[in-house]
């Protein structure tokens, strides 16, 4: 009987612990006491937002969204790509409004992780942090490799600057040693040395850009924002060049039929374009570094989405007006649609500038992704889930330098060891999960803490958060129904996160609580002795 009682008590205490909610006032007090330097204004936030959103998607994915994939697994929207972009924008705006409410109410580092801790408890917060690491850290690695691909493609117009083994992604990551050896055999002109029969190559451009971005972030968010601003200006200028130059050669007959594959093609296009909008959520992780988060963050988040949507719609109109997307299209259009169209118009110089624009776009995305990853981990360190050493700020730059370098060096390891096709698929699930959690958290905190000041409130709640949950949940279900192994790997990733929490995060938090309790007891003893 006693054993049964102790078991019930243990279970009750365990459940109480893992559902422990951290009061938002406590979060704000911690941020005020030992927070990051406040350097970001509304213009900086819009620059970071546009920099994070407009990346490789508009330069590459838009071709597949318009014409469909080469293997026929994804239908194209055709000229109705404009409608697909607006649908994707609405799907994002519901979640963006929820992020804005939280970011103004609890303007501290951590984003969705912090909001979950304030509403759903410790274990849920850990799991969201674990999922966000998948989204930001793995996304950072994947974008670095994409940057390398664009860089090598850009150099191909000149003399070979780098030997193949220093510019080729590690071929052993394809599947196995046999597949890697076959790649080398099928490409005899690409000289890649071998060691014990295994091809040896290092993606040097990806590694170097990761180290460069890390150094810039260590110097501070203000310097990072300046660089992001330059990159945003370059890519917007290149996109404007494409729109203006291409508009004179648009053939209206290419817009007929408007939706060659009907609603199915429009929604398939919206699903692909959705990922060209991802990045606005990273702004919420920088809330602690905003000068006036209550006013500036909603403008930054919503403003960057509106600007991006306008840019995307203009590109879609010109692109589908230049190329007939109702039937088969060249493979070059699917890989680099904007550059292909400029080449077909005999504007090779413009195609070269578009390549530069894609590099600039990816560079700004890298900046925001690594910054977001470090701010999530910084918040988790503050909550004693990981080592408190990562809380230490650089004495000169007031940035989490040790944490930033740790993320950067782990990214280098990931570039050499991860199968990025699978990793990128997993990132999509991480994104959907974090969006859904934030929408749910808004509804919960409206009930549990209705009197808390909300400088920005989600309009038409609870309808807006519910629509965000439905849109993201529907896209997540749609994605899981596609033939891909990542749908099975995501629950495995969550399982690993739960195990690490139980064996490390949970234990470390309890040890810290005991330490704080002992310190309080000792303090009371000293006060009594006085």
Residue ranges and their predicted role:
Residues 1-63, 67-78, 82, 92-93, ...:
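Membrane-interface "cap" regions at the ends of multi-pass membrane proteins
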Residues 22-23, 29-37, 70, 81-82, ...:
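Helix-loop-helix junctions that connect adjacent transmembrane segments
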Residues 42, 203-207, 291-295, 299, ...:
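Loop-to-transmembrane helix boundary motifs in multi-pass membrane proteins
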Residues 58-180, 187-188, 307, 485, ...:
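Extracellular loop-to-transmembrane helix junctions
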Residues 59-62, 108, 131-149, 272, ...:
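Membrane-helix boundary/coupling elements in multi-pass transport proteins
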Residues 63-82, 132, 143-149, 155, ...:
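Transmembrane helix-loop boundary segments of multi-pass membrane transporters
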Residues 198-201, 213, 260, 389-401, ...:
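C-terminal membrane-solvent junction of multi-pass transporters and transport-like membrane proteins
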Residues 425-426, 430-431, 460-530:
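A generic transmembrane alpha-helix motif of multi-pass inner-membrane proteins
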């Amino acid at each position: 009987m006693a054993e049964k009682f102790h078991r019930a008590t243990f279970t009750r205490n365990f459940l109480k612990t893992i559902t422990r909610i951290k009061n938002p006032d406590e979060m704000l007090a911690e941020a005020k006491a030992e927070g990051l330097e406040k350097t970001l204004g509304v213009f900086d936030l819009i620059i970071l937002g546009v920099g994070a959103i407009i990346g490789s998607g508009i330069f590459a994915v838009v071709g597949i969204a318009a014409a469909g994939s080469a293997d026929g697994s994804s239908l194209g929207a055709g000229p109705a790509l404009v409608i697909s972009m607006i649908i994707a924008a609405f799907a994002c705006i519901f979640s963006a409004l929820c992020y804005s409410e939280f970011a103004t109410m609890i303007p501290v580092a951590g984003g969705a992780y912090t909001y979950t801790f304030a509403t759903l408890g410790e274990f849920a917060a850990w799991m969201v942090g674990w999922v966000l690491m998948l989204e930001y850290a793995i996304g950072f690695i994947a974008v670095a490799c994409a940057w390398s691909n664009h860089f090598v493609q850009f150099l191909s117009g000149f003399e070979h600057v780098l030997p193949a083994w220093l510019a080729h992604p590690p071929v052993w990551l394809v599947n196995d040693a046999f597949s890697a050896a076959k790649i080398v055999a099928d490409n005899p002109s690409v000289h890649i040395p071998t060691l014990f029969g295994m091809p040896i190559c290092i993606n040097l451009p990806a590694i170097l850009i990761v180290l460069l971005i890390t150094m810039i972030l260590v110097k501070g968010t203000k310097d990072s924002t300046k660089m992001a601003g330059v990159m945003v200006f370059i890519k917007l200028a290149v996109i404007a060049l494409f729109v203006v130059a291409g508009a004179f050669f648009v053939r209206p007959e290419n817009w007929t039929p408007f939706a060659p594959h009907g609603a199915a093609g429009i929604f398939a296009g919206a699903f692909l374009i959705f990922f060209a909008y991802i990045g606005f959520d990273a702004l919420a992780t920088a809330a602690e570094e905003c000068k006036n988060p209550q006013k500036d963050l909603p403008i930054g988040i919503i403003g960057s989405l509106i600007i991006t949507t306008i840019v995307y719609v203009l590109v879609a109109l010109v692109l589908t007006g230049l190329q007939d997307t109702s039937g088969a299209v060249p493979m070059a259009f699917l890989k680099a649609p904007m550059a292909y169209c400029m080449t077909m118009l005999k504007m090779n110089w413009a195609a070269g500038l578009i390549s530069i624009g894609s590099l600039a776009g990816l560079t700004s995305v890298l900046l925001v992704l690594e910054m977001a990853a470090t701010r999530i981990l910084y918040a988790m360190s503050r909550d004693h889930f990981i080592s408190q050493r990562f809380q230490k700020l650089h004495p000169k730059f007031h940035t989490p330098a040790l944490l930033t370098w740790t993320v950067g060096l782990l990214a280098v390891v990931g570039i050499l060891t991860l199968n990025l096709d699978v990793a990128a698929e997993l990132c999509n699930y991480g994104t959907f999960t974090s969006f859904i959690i934030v929408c749910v958290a808004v509804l919960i905190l409206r009930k549990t803490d209705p009197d808390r000041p909300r400088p920005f409130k989600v309009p038409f709640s609870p309808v807006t958060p519910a629509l965000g949950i439905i849109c993201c949940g529907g896209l997540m279900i749609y994605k899981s129904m596609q033939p891909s192994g990542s749908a099975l790997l995501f629950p495995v990733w969550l399982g690993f996160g739960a195990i690490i929490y139980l064996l490390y995060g949970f234990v470390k938090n309890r040890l810290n609580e005991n330490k704080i309790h002992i310190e309080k007891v000792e303090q009371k003893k000293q006060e009594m002795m006085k």
